[in-house]
Amino acid sequence: MKLSVVILNYNVRYFLELCLKSVEAAFKNIEAEIIVVDNYSTDESCSMVKTLFPKVKLIQKKENWGFSKGNNIGVVEAKGEYICILNPDTVIAEDTFENILAFADLQDNLGIIGCRLIDGKGRFLPESKRNVPTPMVSIKKIFGNSTDYYATQLNQHETGKVDILVGAFMLIKRELYNTVKGFDEDYFMYGEDVDLSYRVIKMGLDNIYFGNTTVIHYKGESTLKDIKYAKRFYQAMKIFYKKHFRNYGLFDLLVWIGSKVMPFFMSGNLEKTQKAKAYVLISERAIQTLRGFTKPLSVIQKIETYEKGTEYIFDNNSLSFKQIMRQIDGFPENSESTFKILPKNSNFILGSNSSKTRGEVVFLKDN
């Protein structure tokens, strides 16, 4: 088997459904499997997987083990040559795995491969490629200076070596994952991807950012970035520095102080979301509306012009995931547009209008 996709889920039933549909669509020419580890969700995630995706291997836990342990549990069951660690609030294109695996097979000193992530509004997520967060770099980031935190030396569309990749999408050989013993389970949430990336480059292997493939990451859906995030960030960095840096005490104190200040910076920088002025469905089907959608809706087959303040709904019943992502990615950043996807054979649309807030699910009648 070539690939095992491991998805750790916690209470994101509808985002998980969309994610799984996109992953299955990307398996056309690949011998692959999907493993979903559920961290004791209280929604209908598990029943949905059993009903709609019977081929998916579902591992149901009786408590929330956190990101590291949950993913490690999934990898134990994996059979693929490669492992893809994938967040449940992501959407991939039909050729994502085909392209990235072809590239991976050509590398002779491969560590981990990451790819270009965009949020629900089509904006590039800079954490897709990062530098090692040394104590000083982290302190600068906490106080608003991210220049050295992100790997800006590499353009978002380029491919090249970087230090740190993001846990929302990581491709790694299963043999290497097992050699480094996977994610460090001392981390509950945040920091585990930094730690894994750092351990791999310390082995002399190359972590590579693959800018030719784009994945939507509805960042903020699983956890809100607030005071809890600040505390977890501090705890994660404390573990990382204690493990990898000597004489970290002073930096530990500074990071702790910064983590107390961070929520005030974040609360002042929260993105303002505006209500859409118009709603447009892009579909090649012969339909006039979406049953159960309560707002005025126009239907078009193709976007000819970008209308500011419009919410565009993409119909996955007639458009491929790659087509949808290309159109979202093609919007200018100042378009003030928002986007949602109607998954194939589903009665809901979903999306996220901000990378700092929870995603939104809108329920429909059967269409």
Task: Describe the role of every protein-language-model region.
Residues 157, 163-214:
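A short, conserved alpha-helix in the catalytic core of glycosyltransferases
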Residues 198, 202-203, 207-272:
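Active-site-adjacent helix/loop segment of glycosyltransferases
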Residues 132-162:
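Short, flexible, basic/aromatic active-site loop/helix in glycosyltransferases
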Residues 22, 38-46, 63:
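A conserved acidic beta->alpha catalytic loop
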